[in-house]
Amino acid sequence: MTLVGFPKSTLAALAVTTLLAGCANTFTSPSGRTVTIERTGYGIAHISAADHEGIAYGVAYAHAQDNVCQTAEHLLTVRGERSQFLGAQNTGELGLGRLPNTQIDLFTRFHMNDAALVTAASSISADARASLRGYVAGYNRYLRDAGANGLPDACRGKPWVRPMTQADLSRTTEMSMIQGGMGALAGAVLAAAPPVAGTKTGTTTVELQQAIAEIARHSFNANPEGGELGSNGWAFGRNATPDGRGLLLGNPHFPWQGTNRFWQMHLTIPGRLDVMGATGGLSPVVSIGFNKDVAWTHTVSTGKRFTLYELKLDPTDPTVYVVDGQPKKMAKTTVVLPADSAPGATPAQHTFYTTDWGPVVSLPRAGLGWTATTAYALRDANTLNTRSLETWMAMGVARNVAELRSAMGNQGIPWINTIAADRDGNAMYADLSVVPDVSADMLKACAPSPRAAALLNAAGLPVLDGSRAACAWNRDSAAASPGLIPPSRMPVIMTTDWVQNSNDSYWLSNPHLATGGCHRHDTTLAHPQCHHGNRRSTGWNRWPARQPHGLGRSSQRDLSQQESCRHAGDGRLGCSVYRQRRRAHAGPDARLPHTHSLGPYERQRREGRTAVPRVLAQGQGPARCLARAFRCGASGRDPIGPRPDYSDNARRRVQGTG
């Protein structure tokens, strides 16, 4: 039986071979060109093909076998059709949080711009374009093969299970890119509306002080219904391993449900690609994985992906803002949704307002509402980031950590760190994610009001003066996209010792960064301040490393998450990290249940006690400390419980011989 899989433009027909335990069905095209999907233990899909289009075709087909209902529902999300098919008042997943379906649809239809996405992706490689075509064709092929009645119970016979389009797939990527910024603040975008004459606007001094105090106590969460992602990763170089090769331990903490759930696969293009690992969302590439030469994992970066801009409004018209003395009219977009199927339902609609900085938002919990004189706009650095596919395609064929670093040079990594090791015994930590090019000096110079500075210190919300064009993000010609910090000024550690990261600032990834003379506290995103050997690390501000025993004092921060440390009184580097905002697991507490369960850490998190001490070193040498699974420490005690021995834990060793 011949299965024709590719679009008509493809010269050769495509066949799919599916091998299951105890059952093998082979389909071959007349041309002999095939995609093979082999299922081994635990249902892991091993997919091989002659090119990237075939690989993506097989990935989409196999992923749909396991996740077709989830995929079909996610396509409703990115199309803005949830309320039409699933009910207006029911909720759905948007990025890391949940919102009513109507709100999701309104936001999605407003934000998604298919023409802009096509333009942004116009420069991607031929292999990347072929991969996108193959993925769409593979998913649609599965729908044809299964038929409406051959789907799982959750979506069998449902009218909302429809073929995927290229625009749909581009939208799913965009949704993944913005979930650390615009997506997390979708509720704030929807909440923005011009003030009504005669109603109270503004925030009194007392109210503002109360709001800031509340934010400082509980940490600002733009989406209270949302979740957070976090992971742990350790990479050991030849100085820290018995055989002199690289060793990687990846401990990712992503959800068990939804589009961020990992799906494992093994991809092979003979002579070109042989990579295994996991992907999240609708993606034809391995995002965390290994080949015979190098292995990598990811953690969540502390960098910011957006800034807010405080707008000075025309006192006679709250939809007119002023930049350098010149009035500008906000763009007005009204989105109308089709009525859902409920009896008597009426179409929902919402009007959005957009500035040159981005859409207007309202964050009343932070004291950032829309008044007669002031409004706030959001600029997200990951909007129209279509570079990620090429990044992970290149990572899959890297032969060492240096090539892995080069693969990330196009700045497609949206909001994560990379920890890696290679067969030659090299280890790497890199934050080459997308971060706005805004220095600490600029944060200070462009702070529009004391309120903005207070929000930065208390909640990590960067607010710039939108009434001055000079407060636009710096444009460095070395950046992949205007307004980003270029890779040459982002933090990278290349070492034969070890690195680790647990969603913390880069300087915590190896004690040498904390003790090797990098004690200035004017670190900015725009200027290198820290050195690791001959390599520079830049970016994330931190608390001063040389303080008396006890809690270090705060220093001026840039677009990073705030960190703090306690230091041993005898001068040893016993450093505890206080997670003031991100509540994902930190350091060696990876053994604890993740936030989907009510383990000890989750109970502490819900009680507001989110500080998890972590010892980086204690005079015995960092490699020895890590080799003993973090058992050495300044106090010798763990506040939550004894630390287990990780020596028998599952580890990913770099493959290969010679």
Label each residue range with its predicted role.
Residues A12-L20:
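Hydrophobic helical h-region of N-terminal Sec-dependent signal peptides
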Residues F27-T259, P270-R272, M276-G281, V285, ...:
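Substrate-recognition/specificity elements adjacent to catalytic centers across diverse enzyme folds
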Residues A56-Y57, G244-R245, W256-N260, M265-H266, ...:
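Short helix/loop capping segments that flank catalytic or ligand/cofactor-binding pockets
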Residues L273-V275, T279-T346, M393-M395, P450-P462:
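Compact, glycine/acidic-enriched structural inserts
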Residues T374, Q411-H527, R546, V577:
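Hydrophobic alpha-helical segments
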